């Protein structure tokens, strides 16, 4: 992979978009590398993924305007489909994905961050959907995920105006979960990833599936999804391990060791 690098730290995998001279902008090659990187994740051992951009200036500054400027209608639709296919794969990936947003997250960068389960950003992060100022619409799910995260009114304001917002405003409107100083971003993201990775992985994956599937369903159908996933946990070793440790009378209580079974 020319534009994406990976590193495994215990049960956490860090996937880094590595195109800093272009502020990690997305083009077809970067999107293809992202797809390969996620497909290569060892889902038996990795329990949380951190997605970030190389350097301290940009998570992803957007799609590559140079490569888009000469696209035909058919090429634009194909590029949009490529981005959406990759982002949907990330959104529905069984393992939780945290976006460590270390600078610009504009256009496709904001759309990529929104495809992740959790967004943690540095205090120099900037978010926005500037596409209408370039004569196009968001193409990688921006009109859809932004409304689901921050509400329709705020999403329309940001998309129609093409205005960028800083980290504190992104936190206020619920676009990001937390903000840290740039130098402390990865430390805190990895700390959260480690906490997620310590929990029963089958249960965590089922929670992701329940939330993602249920959000678009009527509540009576959504709770049916949850109850089936809840029930399926009772045939796992991890459920027996977790409850046995909780009920143990030993002092100190033993810590559950989850085996993904």
Residue ranges and their predicted role:
Residues 1-10, 41-44, 56, 162-168, ...:
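C-terminal alpha-helix plus adjacent terminal tail
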Residues 53-89, 105, 135, 218:
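Glycine- (often His-adjacent) and acidic-residue-rich active-site loop
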Residues 29-33, 82, 89, 188, ...:
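Charged catalytic carboxylate motif
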């Amino acid at each position: 992979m020319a534009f994406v690098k990976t590193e495994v730290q215990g049960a956490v995998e860090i996937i880094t978009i590595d195109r800093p001279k272009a502020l990690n902008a997305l083009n077809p090659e970067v999107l293809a590398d992202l797809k390969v990187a996620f497909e290569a994740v060892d889902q038996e051992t990795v329990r949380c993924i951190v997605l970030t951009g190389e350097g301290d200036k940009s998570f992803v500054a957007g799609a590559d305007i140079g490569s888009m400027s000469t696209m035909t209608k058919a090429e634009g639709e194909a590029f949009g489909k490529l981005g959406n296919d990759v982002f949907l794969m990330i959104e529905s990936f069984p393992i939780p994905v945290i976006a460590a947003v270390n600078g610009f997250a504009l256009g496709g960068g904001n759309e990529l961050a929104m495809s992740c389960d959790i967004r943690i950003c540095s205090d120099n992060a900037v978010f926005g959907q500037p596409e209408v100022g370039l004569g196009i619409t968001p193409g990688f799910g921006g009109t859809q995920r932004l409304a689901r995260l921050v509400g329709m009114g705020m999403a329309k304001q940001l998309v129609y105006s093409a205005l960028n917002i800083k980290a504190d405003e992104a936190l206020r409107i619920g676009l990001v979960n937390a903000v840290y100083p740039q130098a402390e971003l990865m430390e805190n993201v990895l700390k959260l990833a480690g906490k997620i990775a310590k929990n029963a992985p089958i249960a965590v994956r089922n929670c992701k599936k329940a939330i993602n599937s249920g959000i678009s369903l009527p509540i009576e159908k959504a709770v049916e999804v949850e109850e089936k996933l809840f029930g399926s946990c009772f045939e796992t070793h991890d459920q027996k391990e977790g409850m046995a440790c909780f009920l143990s009378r030993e002092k100190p209580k033993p810590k559950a060791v989850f085996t993904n079974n």
